[in-house]
């Protein structure tokens, strides 16, 4: 949280912050979205969901990226989604068919080039739309 607050005030910044994380980092992206109202977008990739009672604190728009075949992480999605809906949080779920945990990591046999490209494109679009200043 301290690092995020430091980045918010960096010279030349626009006062907006986006977070992206993979695996454990995805869980951290979810966590930061519940703790920092200054987070504009968050893109957690196959990260564990935050506590449902904290979801109402989310002000960010989310791109939740899940692999199709990850039982533990995916089991937390239905209650997370219900909490997102109840809180009115704007989110998109991307769960490419046939993917495994870590599908975005090109150093593993689980890498899925098409799914990784789709997920990254949607992440960039979200960040451009929510972080760039008008003008």
Regions flagged by a language model, labelled:
Residues 1-20, 130-134:
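Gly/Ser-rich "nucleophile elbow"/oxyanion-hole loop immediately N-terminal to the catalytic nucleophile
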Residues 21-25, 29:
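Gly/Ala-rich beta-loop-alpha elbow adjacent to hydrolase catalytic centers
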Residues 38-48:
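A conserved short beta-strand
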Residues 40, 57-62, 87-90:
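Short, proline-enriched alpha-helix->beta-strand connector loops that line the catalytic pocket
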Residues 58, 64-66, 96:
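Short beta-strand/loop motif that positions the catalytic acidic residue
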Residues 68-74, 101:
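Acidic catalytic loop of the alpha/beta-hydrolase fold
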Residues 74-83:
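Short alpha-helix in the alpha/beta-hydrolase fold that links the catalytic acid
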Residues 85, 90-135:
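C-terminal catalytic histidine-bearing segment of alpha/beta-hydrolase fold enzymes
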């Amino acid at each position: 949280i301290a690092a995020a607050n430091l980045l918010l005030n960096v010279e030349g910044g626009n006062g907006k912050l986006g977070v992206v994380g993979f695996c454990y980092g995805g869980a951290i992206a979810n966590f930061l979205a519940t703790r920092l109202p200054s987070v504009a977008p968050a893109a957690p990739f196959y990260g564990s969901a935050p506590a449902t009672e904290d979801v109402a604190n989310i002000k960010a728009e989310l791109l939740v990226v899940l692999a199709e075949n990850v039982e533990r992480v995916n089991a937390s999605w239905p209650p997370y989604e219900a909490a997102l809906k109840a809180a009115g949080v704007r989110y998109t779920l991307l769960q490419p068919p046939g993917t495994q945990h870590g599908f975005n990591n090109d150093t593993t046999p689980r890498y899925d080039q098409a799914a990784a490209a789709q997920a990254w494109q949607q992440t960039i679009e979200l960040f451009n739309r929510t972080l760039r200043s008008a003008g």
